[in-house]
Structure formats: C-alpha cells, structure tokens
Amino acid sequence: GASPMTAGGTAAITLTDGSITYKLGDAGHLSTAEKTSGGPMAGIQDAEASVDSFNGFSVGLGVGPGTLTVALDMHAGTTATVLGENSAGSDIATGCGGQITGFGFNFAGDVGADLSFTYGSGSTTISAAGCTGDNATNAWGYSVMGLGVAVPVGGMTIAFDFGTKASLHTVGTAEGGSATAGWELSLVMPVGDASAGVNLSSTAAITTTGGVAGDAAVTGGTELWYTVPIGPVSLSAGYGSAAVVDGSTTTEIGAEMSMSF
C-alpha cells in the first residue's frame, strides 16, 4: 500500500501536452549544458553550468530548432543555495536567514551543432527578524552560465564546454566570495569496434576575503582513454592528470570494467 510522506520528503509533478512541459517540485529543472565526454580516470576539470535539482517550478516549450526551459526557485533558508547549487563560502552571509529567489533558463537544440546554453542568477533578501545588528546589511548573490557544443565529424565527435559561476556576499561591511571559470575540449573517435578519446580542460578560481581578491588558482586537466567491448563486457583503460600552476600534479592510470545485458 501507499506510505505517507515523511518530514523532509520531496516530490515532483510533471505535466505535458507534448508541446509544453510543466514541472513542479524537486526536479532537475535546468541542464548543466555539458556536452564533452570523459573516461574512467580523474583529471578532468568540469566546465559546466553549476546547477542541480531543486524544489521549484519550470516551463519547457519548443522554440525554433530546440527547447527553451525557464525555471524559478523561491525558498527560505540559512544557506547560500540557489538553483540547487550551494556556495558554502557564502553561508556566513545567509546564516541568519532570509528569502532566496533564483531564476534561470536553458536552450537546447540542433542549430547545425548540438548546442545547450544555461544561465541563472539568484539573491537573498535578509530576514529582518533574524539578521540584526551588523548582520542587518548582509547580502548575497549568485550567477552561473554554461555553454556546451558538440559537432559530429565523420565518425568522430568534437565537443566544447565553457562555464562560469560567481558567488559574492557582504557580511557587515566586509565583502567576500568566489568566482570560477573553465573550459573543456573533448574528442571521441571509433577505432574498429572500440573507441578512443581525449579530454583537455582548465579552470581558474579566485577567492575574495575582506574585500581583497586572492591570486587565481589555475588547474589544467588531461585525460586519455580507450574503451573496447568484449562480449557483454566493456573494458576501459585510461590516463588522467591534473596539474596546478604552482607545480603540484596528480596523475592516475587505471582501468574500468562494466557489464551490460
């Protein structure tokens, strides 16, 4: 039989007539717009729209060669979270409570290339009851953007992703926050019954504390992989590397096996 929903439980409702889709509740309302591919190893520096599932409302409808989705996120809380993404470094500004409002949209379609673009932003209205004294002037805002493009060339697929996000806050009179930008480029090609791929990526992040911006932390990633089917089993071998500009490097070599029926 049916069980009642427990405290903290979530649900989602989806309604569609084939041309317009409405979503209400805890769902993946917006795409990360990621189109690149990766292998089994670590090393890739993700470049995408930093959004996730959230309890909100969205409408998706056909526009030209693709689909446009518009989403709204409205909730009260004490964490710097909007459109499903938490900016933990800015929780200090929202800890006394407030009303958070976020808006975002995504367009995905075939425009001669497989394209997806997501943009979103959000901010908090600080609680007058909970945020008193120095906290009465607290503020926080978030913005995010992601672009993904994939192009088939013969049997190969070339894909490119670009993403940025910024979380800025004020606590009393002190400003802080973080900003990140990155890109990914991948190429996947058939090799007989197998496939091979390469992914190159880079991210740069800047953190601001007390109104003073720090140096950019830049990390470059490389991943190579080869995947071959062996009956119902797929075997992948790869190499991954993540190098920071200060000279530290993390390297990983390994293999992964998966089975499908």
Language-model region placement:
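Outer-membrane beta-barrel proteins
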Residues: G1-F261
